Amino acid sequence: MAFKLWLLDEETIYEHVFERYTQLEGQSGKLAQDLGIQDRRGGVLEITFEPSGLEGGRKKKRVRRRNKASSVEEDQNVAVDSYHVSVGQSISSLHSSRDNGNSTTGYVLWSTTPFFINWLLYSTSAAPFRLGSQVEVTCGSSCEGHXLELPRLXDLTGADRGKRGILELGAGISGILPVILGNFVDTYVSTDQKGILNKLKDNIMENLSQLTRKRCISRSLRLELPTVEPVGDADITAASLPSKSTLHLEVAALDWEKINLQDKKTHSLHPELSLIGETCSSVYVIAMDVIYNEYLIDPFLKTLKQLKHWLQTTYNLQFHVLVGIHLRSQEVTTLFLEKAIIEYDFTVYDIVDQVIQESRFNFYLIT
């Protein structure tokens, strides 16, 4: 069964937060009671993503069919591909008072991101994000539901002619979202503060082989389509050969405190953002575990507000935001929702799904 959306408002915020943290308390014996670092023991993490669980047998059959030369019944429910990434992180930088202006949480991999990838690709309930379909919306227990049409976030079939983009905010150093989700979109822009970017680029380059479905071009990573050796008298380029589609992948600095897209003169400072507008018909902004204290909430929401206005008015893009929160402070979660809904006038939906509710995470769809 697909996830449902609970439309939150200034009254139901508190009901939602109370219920979610009550659920969390009831599962305290099953869930790790830590801050959410994926693994603090090592500088290099080896992580595998693969189909698993109750549908394992069915997925394995799909994998075997994919390897045949005949027509492929690509997944309509869950992804069939597996991925293995090697992530270099810096525990010492996390605890440093000198690195990146004392903003150091991005130097390690936090567990929200791997959980989100597994849920998005392999959970049957996340199918609307893979298929692009209507999702039931409720406004609380006393409200009849209606449906919200969602564009595809990830096209697993490769048959959809729509152009999709992902803009990642607060990416951190791991680079695992672009090298995995980049397989299913046309443009991916990964952003964070300037001090994070070199390690982010290193991890992306280390795991570039996981872009199994795409050829990757990137100005920031200095990646170009290779030229194939001449055959006879003809010069043939890789772009002219029937092969994988192309992913535009960029890494860029984006400071939430300084961004000002209302000033047209500053647009030239963000060519990567313009790339999304110029190449895509829909964009999902993805932000995983970026709301962990109250001081980040206003800069983050102001940035979303500017991005939404600019991308919709300039390029007429379909604009959606997915925010993943590791449920730590109930006060911070409540304040984030209050500000997003009441002060910044966003439409915010709680993604209601059993797999998520059995975790320490929550995901919100913002439009």
Swiss-Prot record:
- UniProt region (Disordered), positions on chain: 55-74
Q: What is its EC number?
A: 2.1.1.-
Q: Record-annotated residues binding S-adenosyl-L-methionine?
A: W110, G170, A171, G172, D192, W256, M288
Q: Where is the composition biased (Basic residues)?
A: 58-68
A Gene Ontology biological process term: methylation
Where do the coiled-coil regions begin and end? none
Q: Name one GO cellular component term.
A: protein-containing complex
Q: Which UniProt keywords apply?
A: Methyltransferase, S-adenosyl-L-methionine, Transferase
Give GO MF terms, alphabetically.
Answer: S-adenosylmethionine-dependent methyltransferase activity
> Its family?
Belongs to the class I-like SAM-binding methyltransferase superfamily. RKM5 family.
Q: What does this protein do?
A: S-adenosyl-L-methionine-dependent protein-lysine N-methyltransferase that monomethylates 60S ribosomal protein L1 (RPL1A and RPL1B) at 'Lys-46'.
What name appears for this protein in its UniProt entry?
Ribosomal lysine N-methyltransferase 5
Q: Which organism is it from?
A: Saccharomyces cerevisiae (strain VIN 13)
Which lineage ranks, top first, belong to the organism behind this chain? Eukaryota, Fungi, Dikarya, Ascomycota, Saccharomycotina
